[in-house]
Amino acid sequence: MSDVANKWGKKVAERGFAQIPNYLLLINQFLDEEHTLSPAELLILVQLSSSWWKKDEMPFPSMSTLAARCGISSRQVQRSINNLENIGLIGRVKRRENGIVSSNAYNMEPLVNVLALIANQFPNEFPRNVSKETIKKISSSLSAETAKKPRRKLVMPRTQATKEA
């Protein structure tokens, strides 16, 4: 029996597990006050990460799915998604299926880039005290990413692209 099954039980282990980077779980200690995530925003990033199965396919849970999984209202999900997009941690991509508007897809690459920056700054440890200088550097990378990115002009991977009606 695997360690996962030993720890959680066979029936739970058979249903699968999500891979969530530790740096994502600890992200707030690396961000300044302006960029600190609310509990809802962090939970949404965890849920998006758990729905992101393949690198070249963006996750696309609906607002109502995210609301149910997070135990918050759809409006709270919308506000959280807007803020995550505005600070440059995710990108939102509109989708259509057979000409009908479908749930948004979410580009996780900006989050990957921020977590890589954090990992480069702290390759061998999980610090308890992060210097203000490091926090400023990481947070300013968010501001730089936000300034560079075009609003909602992200390209869907070919495997997820849908035909416009």
Give residue spans per PLM region.
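Short recognition helix of helix-turn-helix/winged-helix DNA-binding domains
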Residues: 1-76
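Winged-helix/helix-turn-helix nucleic-acid-interaction surface
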Residues: 73-123
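Charged low-complexity intrinsically disordered patches
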Residues: 2-15, 86, 110-165
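Residue-identity detector for threonine
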Residues: 36, 50, 65, 100, ...
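Serine/proline-rich low-complexity intrinsically disordered segments, especially terminal tails, linkers
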Residues: 64, 72, 105, 133, ...
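Generic alpha-helical propensity signal that fires on short helical segments
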Residues: 55-57, 62, 90, 108, ...
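Small/flexible residues
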Residues: 9, 17, 49, 56, ...
